[in-house]
Curated annotation (Swiss-Prot):
Organism (species): Thermococcus onnurineus (strain NA1)
Primary localization: cytoplasm
Sites where the protein binds ATP: 283-285, 299, 370-373
UniProt xrefs under HAMAP family: Ser_tRNA_synth_type1
Pfam families, sorted: Seryl_tRNA_N, tRNA-synt_2b
UniProtKB keywords: Aminoacyl-tRNA synthetase, ATP-binding, Cytoplasm, Ligase, Nucleotide-binding, Protein biosynthesis
Reaction(s) the record says it catalyses: tRNA(Ser) + L-serine + ATP = L-seryl-tRNA(Ser) + AMP + diphosphate + H(+); tRNA(Sec) + L-serine + ATP = L-seryl-tRNA(Sec) + AMP + diphosphate + H(+)
Descriptive protein name: Serine--tRNA ligase
Matches recorded under InterPro entries: aa-tRNA-synt_IIb (IPR002314), aa-tRNA-synth_II (IPR006195), aa-tRNA-synth_II/BPL/LPL (IPR045864), Ser-tRNA-ligase_type_1 (IPR002317), Ser-tRNA-synth_1_N (IPR015866), SerRS_1_N_sf (IPR042103), SerRS_core (IPR033729), tRNA-bd_arm (IPR010978)
CDD domains: SerRS_core
UniProt similarity note: Belongs to the class-II aminoacyl-tRNA synthetase family. Type-1 seryl-tRNA synthetase subfamily.
Residues given in the record as L-serine binding sites: 252-254, 306, 406
């Protein structure tokens, strides 16, 4: 939520930012907010003046009572003032509700470094890491996507899609999951279960070493929390509601971690607060019909390790860079080639002032796909959830800044591992950093396991 003072003092800045975001229809809201705010403040002044007059009348009534003089005329005036105050207070309440309606639906102010663009096609790659395995048939599109700035190795065999790898490894059963739960669900099986858990523990250990407090949050939150952390459109497109309850299944651990300190005043000395949340995530994926319908890349349920920071405003941009760096280190140790993308205004969403994505090279698909998002939400969430801090007891509290970033979403990380670390024979060579968590170094196709077993008989 934006600060009403910002709109009062710099309406052109807010309008200009809406233009950058392509939210043209909301520009007129700013003038409407200013007009409503003017009436609201005028009414408050009138109420204060009337209260002053009522207090003066009370003094006069007291004096007349002592003197034994009639007070009927003064009581009539006082009662009339009370009625006027009640009318104005009702108007103030209605005006405030109208102002809040707009404020709660305005996006965050973007950082000056955010590129202007209409959609994800205009996001800007800013750096690349790793040596990509590129099938010769994908070479030209790879060079285009990597801007010629990424090292690569050309291979003459086409890596399998993760969907096909899941089948030959017997790593998932999507057909039976569809029977039980519908589309975009899956049973994870065999070594991939261990791999999923290994990825969680690897990311968790790394962040604990960096001073993050591990948290398993509630998997359901109340509506006021969801309203505080995300845009209203997400209630239709993303979030599952528990029928008959004021509870919603979390689409990310970011949401309960943001709500953790709702309506609190934090001690300045305790900032930054660093949390790493581990949770399942539940998403409707409405509006994505036809996209990634096969496999486990875009699903209704998955595990995720999430970084979350409450920081001082002056430190939040530094923390934004640290969060994306943490995520990059994770994917570097997993030996997954990737690019970091600065998300443009048209793809940014309402909550973030700036967002980076990490997009992993998917050797089977021949393109980069999102595996991490890291956002600085500045005070947009903190205002909605009333999360403030102060350094001294009698100091006026200030709003914190909130930041979040994926550390690892296991289903997408598994997709990246299956597509990048497979051999021509279909063996998956796991990155060394996971060996101590998995207890094995590679995953064999099912037919190879059968041969192994037959040889032992």
């Amino acid at each position: 939520m934006l600060d009403i003072k910002l709109i009062r003092e710099n309406p052109d800045l807010v309008k200009g930012d809406l233009i950058k975001r392509g939210e043209i229809e909301k520009i007129k809201w700013i003038d409407e907010i200013l007009e409503l705010d003017k009436k609201w403040r005028e009414n408050l002044r009138k109420i204060n003046q009337l209260r002053k007059e009522r207090n003066q009348l009370a003094v006069q009534i007291g004096k007349r009572k002592k003197a034994g003089e009639p007070i009927d005329d003064l009581l009539a005036k006082s009662n009339e003032i009370v009625k006027q105050i009640e009318t104005l207070e009702k108007e103030v309440e209605e005006l405030r509700a109208k102002i809040d309606y707009y404020l709660w639906r305005l996006p965050n102010i973007t950082h000056e470094s955010v590129p202007i663009g209409k959609d994800d096609s205009e996001n800007v790659p800013i750096r690349f890491w790793g040596k990509a395995k590129v099938w010769e048939g994908f070479l030209e599109t790879f060079k285009e996507q990597s801007l010629g700035k990424m090292d690569y190795e050309v291979i003459d065999w086409r890596p399998r899609l993760h969907v096909d790898m899941l089948e030959i490894l017997r790593g998932a059963d999507i057909e039976r999951a569809a029977k039980v739960s519908g589309s975009r669900f899956y049973y994870l099986l065999n070594e991939l279960v261990i791999l999923d858990l290994a990825l969680i523990r690897f990311a968790l250990d790394k962040l604990i070493e960096k001073g993050f407090i591990p948290v398993i949050p509630p998997y359901m939150v109340r509506r006021y929390v969801e309203e505080g952390v995300t845009s209203f459109g997400d209630f239709e497109d993303v979030i599952y509601k528990v029928e008959g309850e004021d509870l919603y299944l979390i689409p990310t651990a970011e949401h309960p971690l943001a709500g953790m300190h709702a309506n609190e005043i934090l001690e300045g000395k305790d900032l930054p607060l660093l949390y790493v949340g581990i949770s399942p995530c539940f998403r409707k994926e409405a509006g994505t019909a036809g996209k990634d319908t096969k496999g486990i890349f875009r699903v209704h349920q998955f595990h995720k390790v999430e970084q979350f920071v409450y920081s001082r405003p002056e430190e939040s941009w530094e923390w934004h860079e640290k969060l994306i760096q943490n995520a990059e280190e994770i994917f570097q140790e997993l030996e997954i080639p990737y690019r970091v993308v600065n998300i443009c205004t048209g793809d940014l969403g309402y909550v973030a002032a700036k967002k980076y994505d990490i997009e992993a090279w998917m050797a089977g698909q021949g393109k980069f796909r999102e595996v991490v998002s890291a956002s600085n939400c500045t005070e947009w969430q903190a205002r909605r959830l009333n999360i403030r801090y102060r350094d001294k007891t009698h100091e006026k509290p200030k709003f914190v800044h909130t930041l979040n970033s994926t550390a690892i979403a296991t289903s997408r990380a598994i997709v990246a591992i299956l597509e990048n670390h497979q051999t021509e024979e279909g063996v998956v060579k796991l990155p060394k950093v996971l060996w101590k968590y998995t207890g094995f170094k590679e995953i064999l196709p099912a037919h190879m396991k059968e041969k192994c077993c037959q040889g032992l008989e």
